[in-house]
Amino acid sequence: MKLQKPKGTADLLPAETAKWQYIEEIARGVFNDYNFKEIRTPMFESYELFSRATGETSDIVTKEMYDFEDKGGRHIALRPEGTASAVRAYIENKLYAPEVVKPVKLWYDAPMFRYERPQSGRLRQFHQFGVECLGLKNSAVDVEIIAMADTLFRQLGISGVKLSLNTLGDMESRKAYRQALIDYLTPFENQLSEDSRRRLNENPLRVLDSKEAEDIAIVKNAPAILDYLNETSKAYFEEVKALLEALNIEYTIDSNMVRGLDYYNDTIFEFIVNFDGKELTVCGGGRYDGLVEYFDGPATPAFGFGLGIERLLMIAEKQEINFIPEETLDVYIAVMGEKANLEATKLAESLREQAFKVERDFSNRKLGAQFKTAEKLGAELIITLGEDEVRTGQIKVKHNQTRKQVETTLKAVHESFAPIFEEIYADEIN
């Protein structure tokens, strides 16, 4: 039997993980600058958590969820998105308590799972950065989080990212719009896709999110949510737009945008990149003021987003952005003879304890072969250990490029390698 990774998954080998680590480091720094704290939640949760959060009629629930019954008879699902888990953790751990500073700002970097047809930028196991800000409703919160995503793109050097913006209004506005949408779509019912016919009376906003050609043609002339906003929702959206303009963040209004999840209200947004002639959403989110209360927590306004890491990397590669820092090694220890093996092990550990990155030879090869390995690893310095060096305690530390070398002792290296390191690089520093 030939063992292979499951369809829709990917192995991340060292050359790839270096890119991931770079992006994660940048993202962690941006989130920290905005005072967000990391949260980690289980990869699997109760099926009901996700089905209730994302909506029984959503594609996630009806087509994409990985769910199963465990050995205890519990209905379990692999996490398809991060917000529901963050909200569950917020409630279960009583982060709504008065002694907890509001808003509660959380971020995560986690794998998600959806049973989709694998294609470019869409895997069955994929990874997202997510942020959730819970406890305050203020247009400035919405804009700060949108600005944070914009900052991350800029720090990564990603260009051509466009912000698409819409509002779903409050409950009163959505109710009025829902009826207007039903009235508009009903005459076209027989022309809609099977999924959209099913959703027409259950959740007509879902029809706007359809990717089927027949649905896209029909909703093109559908009424816009912006025409059904009450005064409160209008004023809130105007505040959001004004704050974005104050920060010089350009945006376009997409009145048909609804996002793929049921819990949103008021501000929703997507960051979109043109990729091979198609629009690719790399980040999306919005406000979800009713979700905490829906799960029996206290009324809690909230705002957040999810950002696809694989898509981010795909865009960066297309734009020829190199996320791989140059790999270097501080010291390579060339080892000659069995008697030097013990000393090489001790020396390598000593240097690592002094915060130097070290590799050594384990194969007792010829020196020429070891030096070639040092070259491939990008070693800056080489220490050669043979029987003579072990017997006398005298060694030479050689720069692999300039060939400059310093004679010293094993004892001195064990005590403090930093002065020796600095001596070798003294000419370059001066």
From Swiss-Prot:
Keywords: Aminoacyl-tRNA synthetase, ATP-binding, Cytoplasm, Ligase, Nucleotide-binding, Protein biosynthesis. It is an enzyme of class 6 (ligase). Pfam families: HGTP_anticodon, tRNA-synt_His. CDD domains: HisRS-like_core, HisRS_anticodon. GO terms for cellular component: cytoplasm. GO terms for biological process: histidyl-tRNA aminoacylation. Homodimer. PANTHER family: HISTIDINE--TRNA LIGASE, MITOCHONDRIAL-RELATED, HISTIDYL-TRNA SYNTHETASE. This is Histidine--tRNA ligase. It comes from Lactococcus lactis subsp. cremoris (strain SK11).
